[in-house]
Regions:
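Signature of extracytoplasmic/envelope-associated structural regions
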Residues: 1-160
Length: 160
């Protein structure tokens, strides 16, 4: 199958956050500004008297993601808010991390999906495992929450 000729735009995108209990939160009222860094392992350059003679892989990278959404609610005891879901508070206080053994922080899975199938384009997604999300609040018109994520697990790109 040939690569799609339909270009993704913000209205095609969806961001879903899932915890270790398989409970999902679909980000709503978002700006359409999802970003991801697909860095490779650290590069160790091998020199012989100042001439490059090799390249080796060093430490694994810590890829990053970011996105923002409009503030709708800071906390809720009976329903998930995005901040409660990410920080494991209030209604989400009993959530399980996706990290597993050896990972102390609360981690989640983040999926970005771009669905252009309505225009005969592709329906594609990228899944980020073991993500540590943090948030920053900025007052404005509208007030927004910016999220930054560090990816400590695998990254898988796939067709849906």
């Amino acid at each position: 199958m040939a690569e799609s000729t339909v270009v993704a735009v913000p209205r095609d995108g969806t961001i879903t956050i899932t915890n270790g209990d398989a409970t999902s939160y679909t980000v709503a009222y978002e700006a359409g500004d999802f970003n991801a860094n697909f860095d490779k392992a650290e590069r160790i350059v091998i020199y012989d008297r100042a001439t490059i003679v090799g390249l080796r892989s060093g430490s694994d990278p810590i890829p990053s993601i970011s996105f923002s959404c409009h503030l709708r609610e800071l906390a809720d005891d009976s329903e998930d808010t995005i901040l409660d879901f990410v920080y494991k508070t209030n209604n989400s206080s009993g959530a399980t991390s996706t990290g597993g053994t050896g990972f102390e922080q609360f981690l989640v899975t983040v999926v970005f999906q771009a669905d252009m199938s309505a225009l005969s384009g592709s329906n594609t997604k990228v899944t980020f495992e073991k993500v540590l999300l943090t948030a920053a609040l900025a007052e404005g018109n509208p007030t927004s929450i910016s999220f930054t994520g560090e990816v400590y697990g695998s990254i898988a790109r796939a067709t849906v």
